[in-house]
Protein backbone atom coordinates (compact mmCIF):
# COMPACT_ATOMS: atom_id res chain seq x y z
CA UNK A 1 0.00 0.00 0.00
CA UNK A 2 1.37 3.37 -0.96
CA UNK A 3 -0.14 5.48 1.78
CA UNK A 4 -0.41 3.06 4.65
CA UNK A 5 -3.02 1.03 6.41
CA UNK A 6 -5.39 3.99 6.84
CA UNK A 7 -6.42 3.82 3.17
CA UNK A 8 -9.73 2.01 2.77
CA UNK A 9 -10.68 -0.23 -0.13
CA UNK A 10 -13.27 2.36 -1.24
CA UNK A 11 -10.34 4.68 -1.93
CA UNK A 12 -8.85 2.31 -4.50
CA UNK A 13 -9.18 4.90 -7.27
CA UNK A 14 -6.84 7.21 -5.35
CA UNK A 15 -4.34 4.37 -4.98
CA UNK A 16 -4.58 3.69 -8.72
CA UNK A 17 -4.08 7.37 -9.55
CA UNK A 18 -1.04 7.64 -7.29
CA UNK A 19 0.47 4.51 -8.80
CA UNK A 20 -0.04 5.63 -12.38
CA UNK A 21 0.81 9.30 -11.93
CA UNK A 22 3.38 9.72 -9.19
CA UNK A 23 5.05 6.35 -9.39
CA UNK A 24 4.67 6.00 -13.14
CA UNK A 25 5.02 9.30 -14.95
CA UNK A 26 7.36 11.11 -12.60
CA UNK A 27 9.61 8.23 -11.66
CA UNK A 28 10.03 7.04 -15.24
CA UNK A 29 11.06 10.41 -16.67
CA UNK A 30 14.66 10.85 -17.75
CA UNK A 31 17.09 13.55 -16.70
CA UNK A 32 17.67 12.51 -13.10
CA UNK A 33 19.02 9.27 -11.75
CA UNK A 34 17.16 7.44 -8.97
CA UNK A 35 19.52 8.64 -6.22
CA UNK A 36 19.06 12.31 -7.09
CA UNK A 37 15.31 11.90 -7.62
CA UNK A 38 14.89 10.34 -4.17
CA UNK A 39 17.03 13.04 -2.51
CA UNK A 40 14.90 15.74 -4.13
CA UNK A 41 11.67 14.05 -3.04
CA UNK A 42 13.01 13.65 0.50
CA UNK A 43 14.00 17.34 0.51
CA UNK A 44 10.61 18.51 -0.66
CA UNK A 45 8.68 16.39 1.84
CA UNK A 46 10.93 17.62 4.63
CA UNK A 47 10.32 21.27 3.77
CA UNK A 48 6.56 20.84 3.31
CA UNK A 49 6.11 19.54 6.85
CA UNK A 50 3.20 17.40 7.97
CA UNK A 51 4.29 14.66 5.56
CA UNK A 52 6.08 12.40 8.01
CA UNK A 53 4.49 9.15 6.74
CA UNK A 54 5.61 9.99 3.20
CA UNK A 55 8.98 11.17 4.49
CA UNK A 56 9.50 7.78 6.16
CA UNK A 57 8.61 6.05 2.91
CA UNK A 58 11.13 8.11 0.98
CA UNK A 59 13.81 7.51 3.61
CA UNK A 60 13.41 3.85 2.73
CA UNK A 61 13.34 4.75 -0.96
CA UNK A 62 16.64 6.58 -0.53
CA UNK A 63 18.19 3.58 1.19
CA UNK A 64 16.90 1.33 -1.60
CA UNK A 65 18.69 3.38 -4.28
CA UNK A 66 21.96 3.64 -2.35
CA UNK A 67 21.75 6.90 -0.42
CA UNK A 68 22.81 6.43 3.20
CA UNK A 69 21.88 8.04 6.51
CA UNK A 70 24.94 10.30 6.37
CA UNK A 71 23.80 11.72 3.03
CA UNK A 72 20.23 12.20 4.23
CA UNK A 73 21.44 13.94 7.38
CA UNK A 74 23.60 16.24 5.23
CA UNK A 75 20.47 17.16 3.23
CA UNK A 76 18.54 17.85 6.44
CA UNK A 77 21.40 20.03 7.69
CA UNK A 78 21.54 21.95 4.40
CA UNK A 79 17.81 22.65 4.59
CA UNK A 80 17.81 23.78 8.23
CA UNK A 81 17.90 27.53 7.54
CA UNK A 82 15.19 27.19 4.88
CA UNK A 83 12.84 24.66 6.49
CA UNK A 84 13.27 25.72 10.12
CA UNK A 85 13.96 23.81 13.29
CA UNK A 86 10.59 22.06 13.78
CA UNK A 87 10.62 20.45 10.33
CA UNK A 88 14.31 19.66 10.59
CA UNK A 89 13.83 17.98 13.97
CA UNK A 90 10.85 16.01 12.63
CA UNK A 91 12.97 14.79 9.72
CA UNK A 92 15.80 13.78 12.06
CA UNK A 93 13.30 11.88 14.23
CA UNK A 94 12.04 10.04 11.12
CA UNK A 95 15.63 9.26 10.11
CA UNK A 96 16.52 7.93 13.56
CA UNK A 97 13.35 5.85 13.63
CA UNK A 98 14.06 4.35 10.22
CA UNK A 99 17.81 3.95 10.70
CA UNK A 100 18.84 3.50 14.35
CA UNK A 101 22.22 4.85 15.44
CA UNK A 102 23.83 1.41 15.56
CA UNK A 103 23.16 0.80 11.86
Q: Residue locations for each model-derived region?
A:
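Short helix/strand-capping turn motifs
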Residues: 15-20
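Short, small-residue-biased leader/transition segments that mark boundaries at the very start
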Residues: 2-9
Amino acid sequence: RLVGSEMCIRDRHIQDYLSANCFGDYVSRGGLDAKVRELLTFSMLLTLGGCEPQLRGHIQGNLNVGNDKRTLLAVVTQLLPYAGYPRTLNAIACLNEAIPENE
